[in-house]
């Protein structure tokens, strides 16, 4: 009986070693954050549309809502104030609602959806940018070090804005209209 227990312990120990080794390999392969990127807070002197490169559509507060927690999404650009933003020291304030673009609950999870909330100067409401060689911008959340992304890269109206690992794809690249020097 002692021999059987001993071999079970050896098998269990070997499985733990394999699990730890695989877990270490998986952790090493996890996507990067923007922490190593040189990003700076956004400030604009005027109200701007924020357009995603992949679809050319605008970042907006859904349905002209003014409540805390209203979702932020992409939509065909209409020129409405719910699609205009003013950036001051990295805080994006929606012109229509007067509320800030944020990742709720200080989430650091990929795929967390962006919304608007009463501005409170939290790091989850602060955004920075990184320029690329083609003039588009990665918009980075100061708290999570993840980038603003249109979910699944779809061009559909209503696709939610989320945060995701920076990969440089066009649904993570943004333009300001009118163009601003950052």
Model-derived features: where do they sit?
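Secretory targeting and sorting signals
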Residues: 1-34
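N-terminal compositionally biased, intrinsically disordered segments and leader/signal-like regions
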Residues: 3-6, 20, 45-47, 79, ...
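Short stretches within intrinsically disordered, low-complexity N-terminal or propeptide regions
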Residues: 18, 29-34, 47, 94, ...
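Extracellular glycan-recognition/adhesion modules and their associated mucin-like linkers
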Residues: 35-66, 82-108, 126-155, 173-182
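Short, tandemly repeated low-complexity microdomains enriched for cysteine and small residues
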Residues: 66-86, 108-126, 155-168
């Amino acid at each position: 009986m002692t021999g059987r227990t001993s071999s079970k312990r050896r098998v269990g120990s070997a499985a733990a070693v394999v699990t730890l080794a695989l877990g270490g390999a998986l952790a090493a392969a996890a996507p990067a954050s923007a922490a190593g990127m040189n990003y700076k807070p956004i400030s604009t002197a005027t109200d701007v549309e924020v357009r995603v490169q992949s679809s050319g559509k605008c970042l907006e507060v859904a349905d002209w809502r003014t409540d805390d927690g209203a979702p932020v999404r992409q939509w065909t650009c209409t020129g409405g104030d719910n699609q205009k933003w003013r950036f001051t020291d990295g805080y994006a304030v929606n012109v229509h609602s007067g509320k800030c673009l944020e990742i709720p609950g200080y989430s650091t999870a990929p795929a967390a959806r962006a919304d608007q909330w009463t501005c409170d100067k939290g790091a989850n409401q602060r955004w920075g940018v990184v320029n690329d060689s083609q003039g588009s911008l990665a918009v980075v959340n100061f708290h999570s070090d993840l980038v603003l992304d249109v979910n699944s890269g779809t061009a559909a109206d209503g696709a939610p804005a989320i945060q995701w690992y920076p990969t440089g794809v066009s649904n993570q690249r943004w333009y300001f209209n009118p163009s601003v020097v950052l």
